[in-house]
Amino acid sequence: MLAQDAVNPGDTAWVLVCAGLVLFMTPGLAIFYGGMVRTRNVLAMLQQNIIALGVVSLTWVLVGYTIAFGDDAGTGLFGNLELLGLTDLRVPPAPNLHVVAGQVTIPTLAFVAYQMMFAVITPALVTGATAGRLKFLGWAIFLAIWSIVVYAPVAHWLWHPDGWLANFGTQDWAGGMVVHASAGAAVLAVLLVVGRRRGWPHTAAPPNSIPLTILGAGILWFGWFGFNGGDGLQANGVAAQALINTHLAAAAGMLVWLVAERFKDGHSTVVGSVSGAVAGLATITPAAGYVNALSAIVIGAIAGIVCHTALRLKYLLRLDDALDVLAVHFVGGMLGSLLLGLFGDSGINPLGKDGLFFGGGGSLLWHQLVGVVAVVAFAFVLSWAIAAAVQAVVGLRAPADVQEDLDHAQQGAEAYHLGGVAGLSGTGAPQRRTGRDNAAARPAQPVQHARLVTATVDPMLLPTTRELRDALLGAGAASIVVFDATVSAAEPASRSLPRGYWQDQDLLDRARVEVVVEGRAVPAVLDVLGRYGVDRTESFVQDVQLATDVR
């Protein structure tokens, strides 16, 4: 380890704080994604993100770090295996390791911890694209293999002084290629393996909690100060420049995205606000420590318009990217890497190079282009191979019959359990599980001349659960069961989704209500259902065998 008298307390404290900030981004990403998926897939999304903290942290210490930052094996492609399990850390990070200038003055373990957090969050980005389709065991295995086989070598190429792209002249301040481009290439590969959700692109999947998404975006924005601010491994002016550039690019990306939304759809949205900010953050990542503040604003503004336009990319490629990871992170990471070739300013950072707009000619732009192509090609091919192998052995795609309700299928739980009527949440949205309301339970009694009344109800028209329950019981219902149903619309309906693009919807989510009631009470039950948009001609009444219990 580095001798204590050689450690700079300020630099060390800054890097350790930044490591904590980047760690915080992973639960922030989970919350950001969790708010945008369907109600019955929230816990699955949270778990798919959080598990990266467990899996990748261990693979990084055991194998990943030595591949990424061990002494080069002689090819510039990966490090040797001398640091397996961190068994030999007697020296600090080498001078100029990663992007720091001069002698490194932090303990090696601080560098290990900081880089670990990047390795953790990178594959977690993929989960936004595959929402509602991943088998948990297969995903955990994919995480472990991908972090070793894909992420660690790419980190070595760009962030090790002997990496082949670093020697070639390609620059990546904080992960435009190492993080965002490689994760985006993995998205392309994994989507080819796991396929599309049922009904896509004609069935809409609106977010379950926009406030949750905004909270997650705020955590990401906050954590990004550590993500981009700590990469110089020093608490100095370059760190301050990277931090202010990060914030300015996010601000510019937000505003331009909102203008694009307003121009396209006639309105702007709060989800559009944070989407534009995240696009700006992803795009400035490779350039944050190499450009000036005005350039950061321009880069963020370009990100806002380009990434918003890229929302259509998944339709052109026919890939079901659920939460637009390709448009925001993949396009953003590649775009920022290339824009560095235009806006690079060696006056900001002595380790940087001048881009085309600052008198440096086109050499840096060429180096950036080669880096982007190499990283994307490598990450895509290996990611596809890993995903296909996992799918063949243990399965990566969840079975079709559980994709609509991964929370119950994988965890036996639900994110929101507020219901008073069996099968309904507190907001009236249908849930798969059924049960009985103990507060309103009645002793089981035979129901003479029983009738089964069946109807489908728009969840948006349902009252509070207690109101519906009381109304049906008051009308004479002996048993109430509610569960999910999907019906075909008479004509395709168009609805605007949160990120500002239009999508035809042919299938509609409905709540199917089944009520067992004595024959004479059927009209009263139909009247109750009629209050909530169910026409009598849309209800089905049939005789049933003697009913003797309340479900």
Report the location of each language-model feature.
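Positively charged, small/polar-rich N-terminal and surface patches that mediate targeting and assembly
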Residues: 439-551
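Glycine- and aromatic-enriched membrane alpha-helices
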Residues: 2-445
